[in-house]
């Protein structure tokens, strides 16, 4: 997915929805970014939802809280048009289905800056269902964001596993590969690579969706071999 195209399209849709209700587009976008920054800085003491709305209401006052149903309505309806800004790679859904057929557990570790209704829509746009994932992080159900390592610690804790038992698969070098710092195994998808800081990607196992499956199958074989030796 082209993140820039999606973000621009998303803001256009949101401004079109809210400008008739007194939200000037530029100020609205600035306030959304400020709320997003508050979520990224969140330390787990509150939900990302609460962090966002506290900051957003700091710009618009109580009006913002009173207008929250407008935002809910936007995500239920207008936001669905944003699918046009998302490039869908069918290999993503195919890979998730294959992993589940292999008996592996799947969690959607997407940056939790959107409400559940938006996240679930994006899952369906990708050809999957929310129920395909044991856990889906949204701004309502977690108090951290990427690239905070505590975000990944929280996911492992909720799944009831040690970080070392997890494989974080992602395409963003900065936001996803940080999971390695808490002991998670990682795999960098290079089909749609994001590397804004131009980091050395040779440090990570990496490749396409097909190579990801090969990587997992190889790892499983090694694990089973080690178990037999024990």
Regions found by a protein language model. Name each.
Residues 26-76:
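A metal-dependent, Asp-based hydrolase signature
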Residues 2-5, 43, 200-201:
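Short, solvent-exposed loop/turn segments at secondary-structure boundaries
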Residues 93, 97-98, 113-114, 119-230:
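Asp-based, Mg2+/Mn2+-dependent phosphohydrolase catalytic module
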Residues 47-51, 65-69, 76-107:
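Short, acidic loop-to-helix structural element flanking the phosphoryl-transfer center
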Residues 109-111:
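A cross-family glycoside hydrolase active-site/sugar-binding cleft signature
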Residues 19-25, 62, 127-132, 160:
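Short helix-capping segments at alpha-helix termini
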Residues 7-15, 32-36, 53, 71-82, ...:
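Hydrophobic alpha-helical core bundles mediating ligand binding, dimerization, or RNAP-core interactions
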Residues 1-31:
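Active-site neighborhood of HAD-like aspartate-dependent phosphohydrolases
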